[in-house]
């Protein structure tokens, strides 16, 4: 059985990768053509009035008329960055952008990274609660224990969208897959 070779990269290569062409790893692009004045008017004003009124009458229509159903917030405070520790919210941004890229590449799910500059559990919960209606799901990432468990549990109680705690659930999924594969051997 051939083992996969782990490739190593220099810090310079990694930094160059993050700055070539455009800084960072994600961008927002229109899902509709924006080539005419009519397109622009439909995309913004006055064209947004019809979906705005429809969603005001029935908030579930946000899943039909907006990106909400295919949009995940990847959220961290940078207090437990894998292999690096507590380096803070903004330092976690490359990791969260990387997670957003993985969502897009492997599941065609759009995601936005959000870094919350706080280690106060209640403040983090309230911050996420205040923006959650814009998203179809929340992915918590690199938040130190035990706060990560408290935050996840509380968000699951108060939000009506899925909350995925990547460090906990992702590890459980990988461990289960490894055990299943070990049984097959």
Where are these regions (language model features)?
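Active-site nucleophile and cofactor-binding loops and adjacent substrate-binding regions
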Residues: 164-173
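N-terminal ligand-binding/catalytic initiation module
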Residues: 1-161
């Amino acid at each position: 059985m051939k083992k996969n070779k782990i490739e190593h990269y220099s810090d310079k290569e990694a930094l160059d990768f993050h700055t070539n062409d455009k800084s960072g790893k994600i961008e927002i692009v229109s899902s509709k053509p924006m080539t005419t004045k009519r397109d622009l008017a439909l995309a913004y004003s006055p064209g947004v009035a019809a979906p705005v009124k429809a969603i005001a009458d029935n908030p579930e229509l946000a899943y039909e008329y907006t990106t909400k159903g295919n949009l995940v917030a990847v959220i961290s405070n940078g207090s437990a960055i894998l292999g690096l520790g507590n380096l803070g919210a903004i330092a976690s941004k490359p990791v969260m952008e990387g997670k957003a890229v993985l969502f897009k590449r492997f599941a065609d799910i759009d995601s936005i990274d959000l870094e919350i500059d706080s280690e106060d559990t209640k403040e983090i919960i309230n911050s996420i609660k205040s923006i959650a209606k814009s998203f179809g799901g929340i992915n918590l990432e690199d938040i130190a224990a035990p706060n990560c468990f408290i935050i996840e549990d509380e968000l699951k109680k108060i939000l009506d969208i899925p909350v995925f705690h990547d460090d906990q659930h992702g590890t459980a999924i990988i461990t289960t897959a490894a055990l299943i594969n070990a049984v097959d051997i």
